[in-house]
Structures are given as C-alpha cells and as structure tokens.
C-alpha cells in the first residue's frame, strides 16, 4: 500500500485495518440516529439511511485519498439536530431550502480553505469561546434528546417540566440511556451502537415502544424516487436559500462547521501527532479541512445536513491509525451497511434519541477547559452555552456570546484583548439582531 506511505509513517497494513474497524464501530450509530432525527423534516427514512451511509463512504474515502489522514467523516451530530428542529420545524423552512443553505455554507468554507482564513480564526478567536460553542451545542442536543425521549415536556406555566414517568416509552428511553452510559463508562468499544442494538433487541422481544423484530435483515439499497435516495438526491433548493432571511442560518452552518472541523481535526491530529511534521503537517491539515468542506457540499447534494470530521476518529488513532488507509477501511465498512436497511428501520425511536443526550454530555465536557477566572470569558461562555437550549438557536447564542465578550473587554478597558476577529464577529452578531428586529 505504497500510496498511503505506510513505511514512511512506520505503520503496518494490519494496524491500519484494525484502526479503521475501531473507528467504524465507534461511529456506525450515525446511520440510525441521523435518519431518525432528520426524518422529522418529512424526508423519507429509507432515503436518509441510504444517504447517510453513502455520504460517509464518499467523504471518508475522499479524505483517505486526498489528504491521507485517518479522519473519517459523516453527518455532524448537533448540526443535524439544528437543521431539523431549529431550522425546518422551528422556522417552518422546507428541507430543500435548508439543504441549499448547507450547500452555500460549505462552498464558502471550501473557498476559504484555500486561504489562510482557518489559521486567522485560530489566532483571533479565543479558544475558550470555541470550547463554549461546543459545550453549548452539547446542551442543545441533549435538551432535544431528552425532549424527544419524553423525559422533559412543554409546560405552559413553567415552560418545561418533567415528563410522564409512568409511560413505557419514557422508561424505555431512560433504560437505553443508562445502558449507553454504562457501556461508555466501562470504555467498551462501540458503546453507542451496542447500546442501541441491545435495547432494540429487548424492545423487539417485549414489544416495547411499538417495536417488533425486522422481517428481514438484508436488502438491496433503496434508490427509488418514491421513498429511496432518489426522493432527496439533488433536491436542494439553492435559489430559496439565497433569500436574505436565510443569512443567519447560512452563517450558523458556516461558523459551526468551521469551529467544529478545526477543533475535531486538530484534536484528532494531536492524539497521533499527525500534523506535527514541520514539512507536511500544515499541508495535511489544509487538505483534511478541504476534504471536510467538500464532503459537506456533496452531502447537501446527496440529501444530508452538514458533513464534518468525526471525533470518533480518535478511537482509530489511539488504535494505531495514522494514514488514509484507516479512513478507507471505515468507508469500506460503511459500504456493507447499505444492505442493512430493514435492520436500521426496525430500531425504535427511544433506542436512538438517548444517543443525542450522550453525545451532548461528551460535548459539554469541554467546559472543563474554559478559563472561568477571566470575567469576559466567563460571561461570554455562560451566554453562549445557556442561550442555545433557551432560544432553540445556535445563531442567537453566538450573538450573545461574542457581543458580551466584546462589551466586558470594553468595560474593563482591556483593549489589547480585542482583535479584528472579535470585532468582525460582534458586528455580524449585531447584524443578526437587526435582521431579527426587521423581520
């Protein structure tokens, strides 16, 4: 496998394959979870199952050959929830238009990937605020997960209240969440998918959550125009996404993908010292970011929300993966999932939504690295995190976070800590509020 430069990276074929299998087990949960979440927009579940598997194959394989890094890519958790509940359902925007917004944001990101923009972002946006955004998205998707599970529910007096714990549906969801947390806590590989499958089998046996055993496990991929991939492939509406009212949504997709990809890719690279090479390190990072943006644009065309680098790639890196062969093995494994449509369709909803909560917990753990001793960071981080679930809007939380950061720095006259990046993002945030006021 000379193409992947295994000898130069001091890797063996066996090590890379094991690393790829490890990453696959850690992230295969995305197929049932993403299709279940985005299916709330009205897109056919069968089409989404096929699209999720297909774009994971294409994006991961593209990164394998283009960047030669062990970073697998798929539909991003958090942004798929934002796409569904905040954009399509919350603002009554057609999924075709939302896909158009994803495509536009991805093209902008791809164009900027050819410049030094990403390095400018790393230098100018405080790391603490980037961590707060990650933690905020974690709160947001955990809130959505608990809501969909029925653990919390709307209350006209208190806005939110506890759900009906007499409901078998709610109790089954709590059991699944506890099972996933248990598998994760004991560091079991593939904890998420094992938790989903184990609880699904229990649901099938006891007919919980209206579940029953799938009639068959395997089938040919569904590419039909009725409820298969053909129903969502190339259905994005770019024209309607260019409407001025879509600007905040496009900016949200762009900024979140930017911070998410930079954080994930550099984090994965740090685990394996992948980008430390003074000669090729920055080139590899640049190519991986380009692959990330390309995958997202292709994802919108295929019918999925934002595609991004998966943090689960760290499991493969920790297993010894250092080259694109790891990502290629992930792509090959996902190719087999194209034939498991009946199995994924039979998984009950409350065996899936607990994954949202667990992913939210992992994302929220980033707060441990935030410097709360700095008053500007503390105030901005608080608003960034808390306003996401409170307003059902990632855009609004960005605005509160960046503006409050700038204001506290001004109040304290810490002019040396105010840079062009903060000023630009604060002006964009102010513009977002003005757009909201004019609507």
Predicted regions and their residues:
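Loop-to-helix transition at the N-terminal end of transmembrane alpha-helices
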Residues: 41-61
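Transmembrane alpha-helix interface/packing and boundary motifs in multi-pass membrane proteins
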Residues: 59-71, 182-187, 252-260, 292-302, ...
